């Protein structure tokens, strides 16, 4: 399994607009081979930004990399450059190979 994240430093006062960009767009992810799940995460507020992270889980690094070369990726990111004033600098990518997964025990109902 592979986890891909991008960290964004969102300008104060732009949080709602940043979230709207993400929550209203078509991600084109649902039918991509190897895609498992996506989360948009809001982190701590700092003096000059609020930290956000996009977090996607893939069956493998190869599946993630194939998506980055796909038409679905181009469609999902075609307006990305127009949103730059919402955050500071460039998104910071981090990719992780999953070493261990621990899941909750099934609870009786």
Residue ranges of predicted features:
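Intrinsically disordered, low-complexity segments enriched in polar/charged residues with Gly/Pro
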Residues: 14-15, 26-31, 42-45
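Short, well-ordered beta-strand segments in beta-rich or mixed alpha/beta enzyme
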Residues: 2-9, 39-70
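Short, surface-exposed ligand-recognition loops at beta-strand->loop->(often short) alpha-helix junctions
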Residues: 10-19
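An amphipathic, aromatic/His-enriched active-site/gating alpha helix that lines ligand/cofactor pockets
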Residues: 20, 24-36, 57-94
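Glycine-rich beta-strand-turn "strand-cap" elements at beta-sheet edges
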Residues: 2, 39-48, 78-109
